[in-house]
């Protein structure tokens, strides 16, 4: 069965973005450190690089290694949309959970106006690669019962406030660390599976 994997960058205090959705405050380290980190993550998960950026990092023809589907909330979709990219991950099946986004925004993007849990349960039954939950926190909170794995890129910064990684009801859910890697730019990536 396919897995739902929440792959996301997080501050030390658990935020994925600032109060206005900003994420440009994440420290990258010096040029060499940032390049080494990005190369490592892009080699492992090339499909998580937006289609418009793939050529610039040498991933134009890179195959999808882990995911063939991306699921995101409107807050995660909006930055690309505002920049004119209506299909930010054209190399993946794209679903945007939103009650306000027009269903005809892009023919390659399926807008899901309700019940993301039912969607994920149906997608998991299909054949294919895993499903990447791109964000945001509200959607992750709603989908917590179906999240099988977490890949948390922990950055050495405290935001103070913003959009939490999970924004939902109190629901303690246990995960087990399966791998952890630290990079020279002080980012730590931890892989978790549901217990």
Identify the meaning behind each predicted range.
Residues 1-195:
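Enzymes that bind and transform nitrogen-containing heteroaromatic metabolites
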């Amino acid at each position: 069965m396919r897995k739902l994997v929440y792959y996301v960058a997080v501050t030390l205090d658990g935020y994925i973005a600032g109060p206005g959705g900003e994420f440009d405050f994440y420290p990258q380290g010096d040029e060499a450190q940032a390049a080494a980190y990005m190369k490592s993550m892009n080699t492992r998960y090339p499909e998580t690089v937006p289609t418009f950026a793939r050529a610039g990092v040498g991933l134009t023809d890179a195959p999808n290694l882990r995911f063939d589907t991306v699921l995101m909330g409107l807050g995660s979709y909006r930055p690309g949309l505002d920049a004119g990219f209506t299909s930010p991950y054209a190399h993946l099946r794209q679903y945007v959970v939103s009650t306000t986004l027009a269903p005809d925004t892009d023919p390659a993007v399926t807008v899901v106006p309700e019940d993301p849990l039912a969607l994920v349960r149906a997608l998991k039954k299909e054949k294919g690669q895993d499903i990447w939950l791109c964000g945001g926190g509200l959607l992750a909170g709603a989908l917590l019962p179906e999240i099988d794995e977490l890949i948390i890129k922990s950055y050495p910064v405290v935001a103070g406030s913003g959009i939490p990684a999970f924004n939902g009801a109190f629901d303690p859910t246990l995960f087990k660390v399966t791998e952890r890697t630290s990079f020279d730019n002080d980012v730590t990536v931890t892989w978790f599976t549901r217990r």
